[in-house]
């Protein structure tokens, strides 16, 4: 049976008439996953349309986020016993966590926007919205959230690619994102953000 990974481009256009507009696209909207699937590469590209066709005096930056379907997850903490023996210790459940998350930017994210804006738009591995199912202390929650992010980074299910978005002539952009072999099937969403002077000018 062929299972399909389906990509949806989010429609989050900024409605202000005097603001620029992003026109995004992807190289393929369906990726067939069969037993021999070893991974793929997805090209995300698009154009920046400025009001009246006027180019700005200063170039803007681009951030692209690709997210997989959300899923519940249980994270266990290992504890060493008697030297080489490991056992499960504490654990934490998350009601919702993205099964895949990749972020790519034209420059390092911390140089583009502040932490508050990054958190609002869920930009960056440290700002992925997780929904803990268990009540616990803030320290415990932060520890398990960091553990989940680190685990998924090691398996290439969480990806951070600063400086990988190419912008040509200030209006055309493109970036290639890897799709690992163990990526889960389902609906994926791509979002693109236009950033300048610490502000999100447009999103699509």
Positions of predicted regions on the chain:
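N-terminal edge beta-strand
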Residues: 19-36
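Short acidic/polar inter-strand loop motif in beta-rich domains
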Residues: 71-72, 109-112, 195-201
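Bacterial N-terminal signal peptides that target proteins for export
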Residues: 1-6
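Extended, hydrophilic extramembrane loops/domains of integral membrane proteins
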Residues: 182-204
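Short solvent-exposed capping/turn motifs at the termini of beta-strands
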Residues: 48-51
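Membrane-proximal low-complexity regions enriched in glycine and acidic/polar residues
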Residues: 78-187
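Hydrophobic h-region of N-terminal signal peptides that target proteins for export
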Residues: 7-18
């Amino acid at each position: 049976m062929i299972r399909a990974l389906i990509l949806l481009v989010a429609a989050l256009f900024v409605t202000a008439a005097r603001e620029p507009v992003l026109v995004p696209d992807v190289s393929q909207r369906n990726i067939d996953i069969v037993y021999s699937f070893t991974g793929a590469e997805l090209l995300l590209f698009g154009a920046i349309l400025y009001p009246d066709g006027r180019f700005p005096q200063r170039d803007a930056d681009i951030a692209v986020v690709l997210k997989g379907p959300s899923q519940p997850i249980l994270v266990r903490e290992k504890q060493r016993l008697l030297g080489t023996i490991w056992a499960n210790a504490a654990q934490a459940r998350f009601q919702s966590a993205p099964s895949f998350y990749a972020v790519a930017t034209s420059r390092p994210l911390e140089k583009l926007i502040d932490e508050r804006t990054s958190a609002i738009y869920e930009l960056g591995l440290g700002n992925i919205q997780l929904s803990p199912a268990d009540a616990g202390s803030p320290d415990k929650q932060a520890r398990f959230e960091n553990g989940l992010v680190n685990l998924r980074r090691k398996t290439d299910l969480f990806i951070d690619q600063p400086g990988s978005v190419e912008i040509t002539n200030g209006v055309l952009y493109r970036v290639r994102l890897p799709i690992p072999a163990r990526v889960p099937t389902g609906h994926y969403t791509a979002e693109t953000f236009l950033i300048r002077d610490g502000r999100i000018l447009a999103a699509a």
